[in-house]
Design a protein with these regions (language model features):
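Glycine-rich adenosine-cofactor-binding loop
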Residues: 15, 113-116, 123-127, 132-153, ...
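Short glycine-rich anion-binding loops that position phosphate/pyrophosphate groups of nucleotides
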Residues: 68-75, 144, 191-194, 221
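Active-site capping/gating segments
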Residues: 121-125, 234-260
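NAD(P)-binding Rossmann-fold cofactor-contacting core
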Residues: 154-172
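Rossmann-like adenosine-cofactor binding region
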Residues: 168-239
Length: 260
């Protein structure tokens, strides 16, 4: 969405690309059910620059806050006046609250991370069925993986991160039957499999999965990802990221609606 005139939208989403995102549809439906008259729009920014951030706020004088998705969850932190401790620990922000004075002038941009809460509550039923001492494997080492690790930590579950490059605790080649016996919960925190690239998938050794294993994908579009399909074919329990999306969205809205 390229703006050239003033908007009256209340909330929004910045990132690139945004064609796959269901956030606008979720909030539009919610506001219609509430009868609040509020609105939510996508702002697809090709680059996150000072000019882009300034334009976002200037051309949207009614904007109370916005969500942040890939690839800007880390970069946006450079433009904020304060960052919530949980977001600091994760090293990524997915929610920005805009504070204004009585004249509408922006007084502060404050960053939060509601991905942690969203994933924590989505994965809780799986985490609660883990045997004492069992850990989780997190596929990926980006900002999403850090939110997943923080959420699991809050549930008392240790985790290991997996990457191609060796930036994580393990590489994909390190995953063995013994590793999965110790880590029966696997989380795909990569964007692989997201629409329109639905055939893509992490190079995970699916043949080592079986009944009793649990696989949670953060991707929600499509509803069944290639990661989920392959895991389910081996008898593993699977779940997509739609509940996480809804929970983090509601947590973001609560932040925006809370008076400073």
């Amino acid at each position: 969405m390229t703006q050239t005139r003033l908007s009256t939208t209340d909330y929004g989403l910045i990132g690139r690309p945004l064609a796959h995102s269901q956030s606008k549809a979720f909030f539009t439906r919610l506001f219609a059910e509430e009868g609040s008259g509020e609105s939510y729009d996508n702002f697809e920014l090709q680059e996150l620059t000072p000019q882009a951030m300034y334009g976002l706020v200037l051309l949207n004088p009614q904007l109370k806050g916005f969500n942040v998705t890939a690839p800007y969850k880390v970069a946006v932190m450079d433009y904020l006046d304060s960052i919530d401790p949980a977001a600091e620990r994760v090293g990524a922000v997915n929610t920005v609250k805009i504070e204004r004075d009585a004249t509408g002038r922006v007084t502060a941009l404050r960053g939060f991370n509601t991905d942690v809460e969203g994933f924590r509550e989505s994965v809780r039923p799986m985490a609660e069925r883990l045997a004492p001492g069992a850990s989780a494997l997190i596929l990926g080492t980006g900002g999403a993986s850090k939110a997943v690790a923080e959420a699991l930590s809050q549930l008392g579950v240790k985790s290991l991160r997996v990457s191609h490059s060796g930036k994580g605790d393990l590489t994909y080649d390190d995953i063995t039957a013994d590793v999965l016996a110790a880590c029966p919960l696997v989380v795909n925190a990569t964007p692989l499999g997201t629409y329109p690239d639905t055939a893509s998938c992490p190079p995970f050794p699916f043949g080592l999965l079986g009944p009793g294993m649990m696989c949670h994908d953060l991707v929600y579009n499509p509803a069944e990802t290639e990661f989920m399909r392959r895991a389910a074919a081996q008898g593993a329990e699977v779940k997509n990221g739609l509940e996480m999306l809804h929970r983090q969205a509601l947590a973001s809205l609560a932040i925006w609606r809370t008076k400073s």
